[in-house]
């Protein structure tokens, strides 16, 4: 990649892997992943978590949701756009010699953790989802079939182990991934 040619570009790319957390934590996606709410939808005892808004952002029974629902489409994008960023960082930072080995390990640890986290959110919401661990280089390869949940969970565990072995700091005051993050997932 032409982008990963300076330390600042590499840091910016790593910071970009956190972009998906904004969608995950400041939108309806957090409601869908909170067991208190989503279990009510699964058993059909609740129609929506809020009293106002249009029909798309007032969750209907899960059995009545359609893929054209904008909220569902946003959930899907909030899973796969950040995964693409993580895959790009993992591939390009692994190949660079611009930064120190310790900094490279830290950045890779962050990207592996976040990829695991995004996959965890995705599999909780959708079940079987596409498993993609390399960045897109050819738009003809974008549409890939869903993989079994078991494969996704195996990838999550593998990524978390790599994050654990990366030498992340115990805690991080900047809000970046740390060893403490691994404990809490």
PLM feature segments, named:
Residues 1-110, 114-154, 169-175:
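Short acidic-aromatic linear motifs embedded in glycine-rich loops, typified by GG[WY][YF]DAGD(H)
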Residues 180:
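Aromatic- and glycine-enriched pocket-lining scaffold segments that form the walls
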Residues 164-165:
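Amphipathic alpha-helical segments of tetratricopeptide repeats
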Residues 183-185:
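Conserved small/polar residues in nucleotide/adenosyl-binding loops
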């Amino acid at each position: 990649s032409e982008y990963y040619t300076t330390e600042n570009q590499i840091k910016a790319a790593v910071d970009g892997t956190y972009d998906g957390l904004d969608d995950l934590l400041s939108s309806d996606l957090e409601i869908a992943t909170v067991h208190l709410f989503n279990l009510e939808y699964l058993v059909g005892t609740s129609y929506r978590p809020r009293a106002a808004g249009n029909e798309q952002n007032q969750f209907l029974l899960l059995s009545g949701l359609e893929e054209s629902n904008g909220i569902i489409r946003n959930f899907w994008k909030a899973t796969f756009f950040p995964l693409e960023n993580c895959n790009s960082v993992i591939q390009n930072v692994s190949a660079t010699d611009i930064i120190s080995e310790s900094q490279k390990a830290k950045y890779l640890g962050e990207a592996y953790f976040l990829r695991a986290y995004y996959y965890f959110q995705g599999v909780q919401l959708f079940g079987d989802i596409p498993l993609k661990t390399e960045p897109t280089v050819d738009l003809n390869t974008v549409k890939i079939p869903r993989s079994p949940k078991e494969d996704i969970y195996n990838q999550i565990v593998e990524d978390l182990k790599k994050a654990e072995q990366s030498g992340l700091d115990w805690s991080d005051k900047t809000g970046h991934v740390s060893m403490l993050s691994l404990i809490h997932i």
